[in-house]
């Protein structure tokens, strides 16, 4: 399964959740609501989940092996870093223009 598109849908500036992403596989399947989290001095992804009746969470969809999880995480985090940098550059240029 090949990752064919990653969209960073929303970036947050406060709190441990830094962004929400959607990932498309083979131009045929999209997984929404992958969360990008920063905690314990590192970034990682959290797959979409649903709250159970006992107040625990269960992933709706998730990688079933470590290799694919690492590939997915690297790709999503790189897309986040690129989007966050672009957003930062936009803010800086907007500030410069307002001066």
Model-derived segments and spans:
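Single-stranded nucleic acid-binding surfaces, predominantly the OB-fold ssDNA-binding core
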Residues: 1-99
């Amino acid at each position: 399964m090949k990752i064919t598109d990653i969209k960073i849908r929303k970036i947050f500036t406060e709190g441990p959740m830094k962004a929400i992403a959607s990932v498309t596989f083979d131009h045929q399947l999209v997984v929404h609501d992958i969360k990008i989290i920063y905690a314990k001095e590192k970034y990682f992804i959290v797959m979409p989940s649903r709250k159970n009746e006992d107040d625990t969470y269960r992933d709706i969809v998730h990688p079933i092996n470590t290799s694919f999880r690492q590939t997915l995480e690297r790709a999503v985090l790189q897309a986040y870093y690129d989007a966050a940098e672009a957003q930062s550059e936009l803010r800086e240029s907007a500030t410069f223009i307002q001066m």
